[in-house]
Amino acid sequence: MFKKPIIIGVTGGSGGGKTSVSRAILDSFPNARIAMIQHDSYYKDQSHMSFEERVKTNYDHPLAFDTDFMIQQLKELLAGRPVDIPIYDYKKHTRSNTTFRQDPQDVIIVEGILVLEDERLRDLMDIKLFVDTDDDIRIIRRIKRDMMERGRSLESIIDQYTSVVKPMYHQFIEPSKRYADIVIPEGVSNVVAIDVINSKIASILGEV
């Protein structure tokens, strides 16, 4: 008999430790069927634009995401049907030509900077988490990640942070904290918060 999946929303600023918290939850339930879906996968396709136009996109604004498509796919998973999730190419600043097949799972972790900003997404979630990390730590992590994984220059990262990332954090991301069921200071290093979250998930799954 198909059992409706649990959806957990994990948000916070860029470089704040959202993915680490999500992976800590994944690792705590080795026998459960858990998937992590990132909002970043649903950045809009920009193949019709020149590369010069693409790099100017504000990726921290709600309009950069095809959230309608994400909601549609989450509803498919909730109904027990597999979906083909888009894959975003950060170096080309548009979607790649490949997708990832995701089957329904017991738990679906939805992770991204704006997943609590959209009421329609929030309404699909059983647990909503906000990872609250100091600004200095987040920018250092972002610099390391974008230079190593996304081929960005230091100058471009700092320019984007001051002109886009920081203003968007205060306009859209930080205000969404009020919708969180649990706020996690310092992310995955907050062992007490992670234990509380895992206990709640276990109770829903019937593991306790």
From Swiss-Prot:
Q: Name one GO biological process term.
A: CTP salvage
| Pfam families with a match to the protein in the record | PRK
Pathway listed for it is:
Pyrimidine metabolism; CTP biosynthesis via salvage pathway; CTP from cytidine: step 1/3; Pyrimidine metabolism; UMP biosynthesis via salvage pathway; UMP from uridine: step 1/1
Q: Does the keyword Acetylation apply?
A: no
Q: What class of enzyme is it?
A: transferase
Matching InterPro entries, A to Z?
A: P-loop_NTPase, PRK/URK, Uridine_kinase, Uridine_kinase-like
Compartments where located: Cytoplasm
Per UniProt, the keywords (alphabetical) are: ATP-binding, Cytoplasm, Kinase, Nucleotide-binding, Transferase
Q: Which residues cross the membrane?
A: none
Q: What EC number(s) does this enzyme carry?
A: 2.7.1.48
Chain sites annotated for binding ATP: G12, G13, S14, G15, G16, G17, K18, T19
Got a GO cellular component term for this one?
A: cytoplasm
Q: Which GO terms describe its molecular function?
A: ATP binding; cytidine kinase activity; uridine kinase activity
Q: Which reaction does it catalyse?
A: uridine + ATP = UMP + ADP + H(+); cytidine + ATP = CMP + ADP + H(+)
Chief location bin = cytoplasm
Look up keyword Transferase and say if it applies.
yes
Homology family = Belongs to the uridine kinase family.
The protein depicted here goes by the name: Uridine kinase
